[in-house]
Amino acid sequence: MAARVLASVIVMGSGIIARACTQAYRQALANASKTGVAHEATQTIKRGLTIGEAEARQILGVTEKSSWDEILKKYDTLFERNAQNGSFYLQSKVHRAKECLETAYQKSTTTSA
């Protein structure tokens, strides 16, 4: 009998705690959206996804005076080496570096043309 009462107290208590936690979480989300914390957090995350041109050059091991063909050659070499070893993280870094330099070269060719 005592075990049955103890079990029912534990079940009821855990239900109350679960409801309180979900309600507190909802309230925290509402407060965060009012103050703009959620927007600031997403902006911080978005800023972290892009790399700078200097970092992209460093990843690929090229200089500012390197031709586009040289950049593509370095990209292909590094991408294939990391594909063989199975390093998806390094492959994505190399790919992001190429994308960054590609946009930089496109901007420089459109302004010089």
Curated annotation (Swiss-Prot):
Keywords: Membrane, Mitochondrion, Mitochondrion inner membrane, Protein transport, Transit peptide, Translocation, Transport. It is a peripheral membrane protein. The keyword Cytoplasm does not apply. Expressed at low levels in seedlings, rosettes and inflorescence. Pfam families: Pam16. Disruption phenotype: No visible phenotype and normal sensitivity to pathogens, but higher expression of pathogenesis related genes PR-1 and PR-2 in Atpam16l. The double mutant Atpam16-1 Atpam16l is lethal. GO terms for cellular component: mitochondrial inner membrane; TIM23 mitochondrial import inner membrane translocase complex. Induction: Induced by heat and salt stresses. Its main location: mitochondrion. GO terms for biological process: negative regulation of defense response; protein import into mitochondrial matrix. Residues 55-104 are annotated as: J-like. Residues 1-48 form a transit peptide. Regulates ATP-dependent protein translocation into the mitochondrial matrix. Belongs to the TIM16/PAM16 family. This is Mitochondrial import inner membrane translocase subunit PAM16 like 1. The lineage of its organism: Eukaryota, Viridiplantae, Streptophyta, Embryophyta, Tracheophyta. The gene is PAM16L1.
